[in-house]
């Protein structure tokens, strides 16, 4: 299944979650798009709930189904809770950490920064958004990309960087000090439903 490239706001309303991180999609119309308005939502079956939760998380991180499932399977080989490990691996993606640093307003924009070669890891350019960052590694904006308008604008509006990143705004770099803990990850996701979905 290909990565979704359509209108993010429409998808956010359909899934009932803000994919932009701003919440603006759901402020005026907190219901799925369509001609029937707020009364069209149907009660989902158990399978429907599991599928919806899986889709919410997959689209939140902007991944294809193949990438998503591969990461899920990798998490199952780790010690500990499968669902939590899965969330931790998703959070360690390079494009996501660029977003968490505040270098981009959305994960989609962060993925473009990585794709276009503006980001380095430990001084080496990495243009693979799914690159898994390890604790202790440092993520930076390439020196020739420091003056990108999109980066400057994102930095101006960002007021939160998670504790597992130590961010230097002057250098536009951050060290991934440790893996995220479950309490630091999206609370609106029930990863147990996703484990159930793939266990069917």
Swiss-Prot record:
One of its GO terms (molecular function) is rRNA binding. One of its GO terms (biological process) is translation. GO terms for cellular component: small ribosomal subunit. The keyword rRNA-binding applies. Residues 22-42 are annotated as: Disordered. Part of the 30S ribosomal subunit. Contacts protein S5. The interaction surface between S4 and S5 is involved in control of translational fidelity. This is Small ribosomal subunit protein uS4. It comes from Bacillus cereus (strain Q1).
């Amino acid at each position: 299944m290909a990565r979704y490239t359509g209108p993010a706001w429409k998808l956010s309303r359909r899934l009932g979650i803000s994919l932009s991180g701003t919440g603006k999609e759901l402020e005026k119309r907190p219901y799925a798009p369509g001609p029937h308005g707020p009364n069209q939502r149907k009660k989902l079956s158990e399978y429907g709930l599991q599928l919806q939760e899986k889709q919410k998380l997959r689209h939140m991180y902007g991944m294809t189904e193949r990438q998503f499932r591969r990461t899920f399977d990798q998490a199952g080989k780790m010690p500990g809770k499968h669902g939590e490990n899965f969330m931790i691996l998703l959070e360690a993606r390079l494009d996501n950490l660029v977003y968490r640093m505040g270098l981009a307003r959305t994960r989609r924009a962060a993925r473009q920064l990585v794709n276009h070669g503006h980001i380095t890891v430990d001084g080496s350019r990495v243009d693979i958004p799914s690159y898994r960052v390890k604790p202790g590694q440092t993520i930076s904006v390439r020196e020739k990309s420091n003056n990108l308008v999109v980066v400057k604008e994102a930095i101006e509006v960002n007021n939160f960087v998670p504790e597992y990143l130590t961010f230097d705004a002057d250098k536009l770099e951050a060290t991934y000090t440790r893996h995220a803990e479950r309490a630091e990850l999206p609370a609106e996701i029930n990863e147990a439903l996703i484990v159930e979905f793939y266990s069917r």
